[in-house]
Each structure stands twice: as C-alpha cells, then as structure tokens.
Amino acid sequence: QGKRLFLRFEGANSIADVFINRRHIGEHRGGYGAFVFEITGEVNYGKENSILVRVNNGEQLDVMPLVGDFNFYGGIYRDVHLLITDEACISPLNYASPGVRLIQDSVSHQYGKIRAVVDLANGNNAGQEVELGIRLLDGQKVVAQQKQTLTLAGNAALQQELTFEI
C-alpha cells in the first residue's frame, strides 16, 4: 500500500482484455506495441488477487496489419512486467513509454542542445513536492546535470521540460 501498480505488456496479439479480480480494467487493440494499465485501485492488499488476460487473435479489419509475409501469432508473446512506483512518479501511461524523451534540437561537433521531456504523475489526492534530476553522461563522465523541485497537484499529471546546452 502507498505505492502505484502498473501492468506493462510488451506485446499481445491482437486484442487484449485485462481483468483484475474479475473486473475489466481495459482493452488494448494492436499486436505489436507495448501497453500499460494502472491497477493500483483494483488490488486487494493482504489477499490473493487474480489477473486474467483474454487475447483474441482472430482477424479484425480495424487492427493492423491485415496481411504480411510472416505468421500472425496470437496471445501474449512478449514479457509482462509489474511496475511498482511511488505515488508521485515518472508515468509509464504515455503509450507505455519510459516517461522520458530526449529531443536533439541542435547538434554539431562543437554544440548540442537537448531537451528532456518527462511525464510526471501524482496518484495521491494531496499535492506532493518532488525533485526531478537528470544527468547527461559521456561514458562515466557527467557532461551536464539539472535538478528541479516542483509541486505536483493531487491526482495530476504534467510534462516537465529541462533543456541542456553543451
């Protein structure tokens, strides 16, 4: 308790319905992309819980690809992970991304400008102060680093951007 729980599927083909303790928590359509569902509010702490994943790999005209030069295998064919985070965390809910994107705005042999865009989320009703820190490394050497302290409103999500010029 006091943590957030996410199920991250790396691949299930082609329509996956996920149930926690017999309650439907979501559907994912598409066989080749990762997807995440938050299950925090569905878990019975201190008791046995069940996870059921029903996957349909029958032909679906609205789910790509429809044809290919490979076999269309069904079911869960890649790893599934249980992610456990603090209530305020880097969110995995943006299309199952790791929650951090690096954007190279300008790069040359002498100069680089890089933006780090971080998806933050607070799963608590109360606002929380968090510290966001990023270090850019060249091998073992720290090239640049930044830290920011910010307040996340209760049950809120935001994107925070840090810019590095090196």
What are these regions (language model features)?
Residues 33-37, 156-164:
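Short strand-edge motifs at loop-to-beta-strand transitions and within beta-strands
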Residues 9, 39, 55, 104, ...:
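Hydrophobic residues in beta-strands and at strand termini
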Residues 101-112:
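Short, solvent-exposed loop/linker segments at the N-terminal edge
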